[in-house]
Amino acid sequence: MKNIKTNSKYLKKHDLFLPTSRVIEKEYLKDALKKKASAIISDNSINLKADTYPKLDIPIIKVPDRYKTLYQIYNDYYNDPFKNCFLIGVTGTDGKTSTALMIKNLLNNFIKTSYLGTNGFAIDKLKKTTKNTTPSIDEILRYGALTKEKDGKALAMEVSSEGLLNKRCEGLSFDVAIFTNIKSDHLNVHKTWKNYLECKKLLFVKRKKNGYSILNKDDQHFKEFKKVNKRNIITYGKKNATYTFSKVRIVDNRTIFNLKHRGKSYLVNSPYLGLFNVYNLVAAIATVHLYVPSLPLIINACASLPVIEGRMQFLDFKQPFKIVLDYAHTVQATKVVMDLARKIAKNKIIVVVGCAGGRYKEKRKEIGKIVSYQADIAIFTMDDPRFEDLNSIFKQMTCEAKNNVILISSRKKAIHKALEMAGKDDLVLVLGKGCDSYMAYQDKLIPYSDYEVIKNYCKRFKQ
């Protein structure tokens, strides 16, 4: 045996094949046979009957649970990377990336911390891209080992419902599990609301007995998450929580708010705009406070936290108007960003937005309506169309929109049009992709970046 592969595409001669996808297609096993894998590891969820695969003449190793087996193999290979490294998981419909990065950046002031999620993997100045928000277990353990190699003591990671559904976290035990919020999204994957909710709750099943749950008390499903693991629960919200906040206001492109904990009040100066980011930051503060006893020290560190790429990110290229890049792609996130835009805009709001192909069809009408009603000019464009016809997506986005919509297929041209139309003190919002480095077109990932498109266009303002 040379290596273990979980994807038949990457199999080489004498590799051990351990398929991890929920549905094992016949082609995967044909690949294993064709590429002369040394063996296949399977459990009862894989049908390997001789009449189904008569030519499958390579050894089949039966195990009770292939996901746990994969964890055990890689955990041993990487020398138990989370043995002396805190594992912090963040789940929720919105806010996972921001909260996990806030934890990473805030905790990093006190103990070296890494991040893993939508924005890739990061520790010190090292950055790596990842395909999924929550990678496969072998990758998670590899990044855990890399964290330890760099003398890191904690890893803050995003835990998506899809990652939990596909058992990418099988075997892991979390020191801290954080719940941001839950909205009716991603039902194309989970089919029902109940399935989606139960998947999110799995993170708290994977929490250590002596670990902590940090829960958003203002979310209407708070009690559902509280039931999962009743010990060591920390809450945050506007009132009657372990950490409460009040008097939220925006001053000079910063958010100021009051934080109360155990009867004491603190003034927090945050670089992250909006109420939704107050929730995210308070969750991060509560997490860091588990490891750093001095709350005043933590709050002082908040003032100098870095910008989060692709999350309400203001771009300054000497242009006479404001440009904001944001990852908002759910109905709730789009609504929140548009509400905030109305509060900070001095003049016109111009928005570039699209909806992904092949998924979340039910939300297109809502996103199109929200953007067109809140913006002065809405430019609808592509966003990971995959195999779907763009005109079909546009039709759904515009069905309840106002007549202030411009349709431009090319995302690059759509952004150029928005920047060309912008005047002094206008606000240009580019939504949906954040700091993504690709466009999903058919079955290919084509290199693409909203940030690079904006930067290249804005070179003219420096002249």
Q: What is the predicted role of each segment?
A:
Residues T69-K217, H221-R231, A345, K462:
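Phosphate-binding loop of NTP-binding sites
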